[in-house]
Amino acid sequence: MICIECGYSNIDCLYSKYKSDYIKLSVCPECNKIADKYIEYDSVILFLDILLLKRQAYKHLAYNLTEMEMEIGSSTNFHINDNTNFKFFHTYRKLMKLIFMILSFEVYLTWANEEKLLIHSQLINLIFNQSVVYQYLFFIIKSSLENLILNLSLQLILRLGYKWGQGPQKINGNIRDKELFGYKTSVLLVTTMVSGSIRLFPILMFIWPYDNISITKPLINLIAFINIVEALRVVTSLGYVELILSLAFSIVIRNIVSKSLLVLIVRLFLDFNFTEVYYNEMYQLYSQIQTYIRWI
């Protein structure tokens, strides 16, 4: 566990429980403040503080909740070989449920927004000519690919490029070396997914509709970008320049790779001119970049 106030990374436990069910919160030996006040806070308060980008709330979520989830997952029986990647999904199954929920909302939102647009790319026109099942599968694959590529790129850049979590001091002194890789992966993953989930707020627009989606979507994406950068700064302690460049580069990689793979996957099932549709997707991406530049 870590202290969410000063970042001290060798807190043995966040609270002590006595026979009378009396709970005493641990005090950080470095700053002499309560190591993690959110242990006794309601989840709603934590959610609101995360929306407000409070530093302590994000450290509690990314570091301490992730460690508690890891301890619970590791304590349960797991019959598959320990070397398999399935152990990660078993250990962090609550994180996997959170990602699944975010993806489910994102699929619905992306699908609904595309239907509301008057002009679509050639690929989307091809998809909308298919049955609802094929459309649903397409948007599931689209959202999954985009999130996978974005998070993978960001993990590689921050951990290999900027050496986050590789210094002489561990980011969490309680984590064993063999569990450190999965823990660091989860810390960055939960930070990026939760801070980026602000993109889901336009779901409210289906209740209170806005007139111009083409303006609203770039604005929401820009807010999400700022939100992710600020959350990553709190969790990783890297500078704004490094994080802005890392996230921007990861988004470009995500868009290029995901669009290319989507065209390739759809081509396996539908007959169309691959080159024409691919260049149309790249042109759409170029237009989006120009839109964001105008917003900035």
Swiss-Prot record:
Glycans are attached at residues 64, 151, 273. Keywords: Endoplasmic reticulum, Glycoprotein, Golgi apparatus, Lipid metabolism, Lipid transport, Membrane, Sphingolipid metabolism, Transmembrane, Transmembrane helix, Transport, Virulence. GO terms for biological process: intracellular sterol transport; regulation of plasma membrane sterol distribution; sphingolipid metabolic process; sterol metabolic process. InterPro entries: Arv1. The keyword Cell membrane does not apply. Mediator of sterol homeostasis involved in sterol uptake, trafficking and distribution into membranes. Also regulates the sphingolipid metabolism. Required for growth during anaerobiosis and sterol uptake. Plays a role in pathogenesis. This is Protein ARV1. It comes from Candida albicans (strain SC5314 / ATCC MYA-2876) (Yeast).
